[in-house]
Swiss-Prot record:
Signal peptide: none annotated. Residues 1-46 form the F-box domain. SMART domains: FBOX. This is F-box protein At3g18320. It comes from Arabidopsis thaliana (Mouse-ear cress). CDD domains: F-box_AtFBW1-like (cd22157).
Length: 311
């Protein structure tokens, strides 16, 4: 007796809840599933909406290696694995004051006309962050002078092609605290690392879900005192596990050296940390970056080519 086949619509509905990395392994099962996962934009959009999100921390080292980080907080030693031997990236400074948007469909840059740009200096070591169709920066108002400098959170909305501001949590307005780094919690919230002076805590703040309300609110989720001996200033990027109250930091051991070591620090609520080392990096002047990669069935269509790039 053969089992009856499930209706196609029901099969697709079930597959919509399967993580993207698991679906990739199913592509070789049959030609129909291969076409569904690879070429069906309708299914890809439906899968993005319904499937549970997978977050894989990745680091880009100073030697341009991409390394996934597996973190187990239950006794197993964390590990690093090199997945890509070499990536070529541009490293020149662009002093052009125009604002431009790169469009994949035309493989070209487009200058945004009639845009009011904020009078802020975006420091290169305070890296930008993209979330929910917006890009965010921490900037310093050029019109202020020490000791009246204040960090501001700036956003650019790709839908309206306008700059705007996001209010920062109260400690940012108090002497002794400064917004040091910006990151994301999953794909819904911003997180902010506030570094205090020698007598203050180091704090982690998280926003409400971006896009659910017109006004963004902040809540403090982690306070570290005494400060762990990690070095929260130059060259640091981080991810926060809001539920487990764990901070994952990536930075160079030194700063602006020709030979240096890239390290990952796993910091807990008790300020104790685990150190993972990438080894010696030979390219100076760059900082390692840590990001959350979310596998999906979405594809980027490149201009002038039938090839698609998975992400």
């Amino acid at each position: 007796m053969t089992l009856p086949e499930l209706p196609k619509d029901l099969v697709e509905e079930i597959l919509c809840f399967v993580p993207a990395t698991s679906l990739k392994r199913l592509r070789s099962t049959c030609k129909g599933w291969n076409r569904l996962f690879k070429d069906d934009k309708r299914f890809a959009r439906k899968h993005i909406e319904k499937a549970a999100k997978q977050f894989q921390p990745l680091t880009l080292t100073k030697n341009y290696r991409i390394c996934p980080i597996n973190v187990n907080l239950h006794g197993t030693t964390p590990s690093l694995e090199v997945k890509n031997e070499w990536i070529e990236l541009g490293d020149r400074y662009n002093e052009d004051k125009d604002s431009e948007i790169y469009e994949f469909s035309s493989d070209s840059w487009r200058v945004i006309d009639d845009i009011i740009k904020p009078p802020h200096y975006m420091e290169y070591f305070r890296k930008c962050l993209s979330l929910k169709g917006n890009t965010y920066w921490l900037g310093i108002d050029r019109r202020r002078r020490p000791p009246d400098l204040r960090i501001t959170l700036i956003k650019f909305d790709f839908g309206t092609e306008k700059f705007g501001y996001v209010p920062l949590p109260p400690p940012c307005q108090v002497h002794g605290f400064e917004a040091s780094r910006l990151s994301a919690v999953g794909d819904e919230k911003l997180s902010l690392l506030l570094v205090g002076d020698s007598t203050s805590n180091t704090e982690l703040w998280v926003t409400s879900k971006i896009g659910e309300a017109n006004v963004v609110s902040w809540s403090k989720v982690l306070s570290l005192y005494p400060k762990p001996n990690v070095g929260f200033w130059h060259g640091l990027s981080f991810l926060l596990d809001e539920e487990k109250k764990v901070l994952l930091c990536c930075k160079s051991k030194g700063w602006m050296k020709e030979e240096d070591e890239d390290n990952v620090y796993i910091v807990g609520e008790d300020t104790k940390f685990i150190l993972l080392n990438f080894g010696v990096q030979t390219i100076g002047g760059y900082s390692p970056i840590i990001v959350n990669y979310v596998p999906s069935l979405g594809q980027i269509e490149l201009a002038g080519s039938k090839r698609k790039r998975d992400y």
